[in-house]
Amino acid sequence: MQGRLSAWLVKHGLVHRSLGFDYQGIETLQIKPEDWHSVAVILYIYGYNYLRSQCAYDVAPGGLLASVYHLTRIEYGVDQPEEVCIKVFAPRSNPKIPSVFWVWKSANFQERESYDMLGILYDNHPRLKRILMPESWIGWPLRKDYIAPNFYEIQDAY
């Protein structure tokens, strides 16, 4: 089943895959990493100027990593927002996705957290470094194949 945004993207020749609707009726689309930045700019111009949230998850041990964007478009008033969920999948061996910081500034800390927890590299992010874990931390704690260390010592800065 194709939603309104999916039909609009097809009409304008933009490559994507419709993943249907979630339990709240929000349209979900899959965009390839190489197409994501240009599609993000087009969505912003089309009216999706609010990035409500960005998160990431590990699809399966040894499988793909996903970066998820929840966008909102308010065209007919705040009581009738149009929402869409965009999923961008990247291979675990080279998890690179273009950063949308330059489109939606609110992606800054959210993309940094996804990098810190899952190791997804967001190309052209202005300050992609760890935000929750110490810089010396080894590995990506939310990956399903992550092996937690038995002991980790945090040295006091004093």
Swiss-Prot record:
Entry membrane topology: Peripheral membrane protein
Biological process (GO), any one: photosynthesis, light reaction
Presence of keyword NAD: yes
SUPFAM superfamilies: Nqo5-like
Pfam family, one: Complex1_30kDa
Keyword Glycoprotein among record annotations: no
Enzyme Commission code(s) on record: 7.1.1.-
InterPro entries assigned to the protein according to its UniProt record, in alphabetical order: NADH_DH_suC, NADH_quin_OxRdtase_su_C/D-like, NADH_UbQ_OxRdtase_30kDa_su, NADH_UbQ_OxRdtase_CS
MF terms (GO), sorted A to Z: NADH dehydrogenase (ubiquinone) activity; quinone binding
Keywords in alphabetical order: Chloroplast, Membrane, NAD, NADP, Plastid, Plastoquinone, Quinone, Thylakoid, Translocase, Transport
Catalytic activity: a plastoquinone + NADH + (n+1) H(+)(in) = a plastoquinol + NAD(+) + n H(+)(out); a plastoquinone + NADPH + (n+1) H(+)(in) = a plastoquinol + NADP(+) + n H(+)(out)
Main location: plastid
Subcellular location: Plastid, Chloroplast thylakoid membrane
One GO CC term, this protein: chloroplast thylakoid membrane
Stated family: Belongs to the complex I 30 kDa subunit family.
Function: NDH shuttles electrons from NAD(P)H:plastoquinone, via FMN and iron-sulfur (Fe-S) centers, to quinones in the photosynthetic chain and possibly in a chloroplast respiratory chain. The immediate electron acceptor for the enzyme in this species is believed to be plastoquinone. Couples the redox reaction to proton translocation, and thus conserves the redox energy in a proton gradient.
Assembly description: NDH is composed of at least 16 different subunits, 5 of which are encoded in the nucleus.
Protein name, UniProt field: NAD(P)H-quinone oxidoreductase subunit J, chloroplastic
Gene: ndhJ
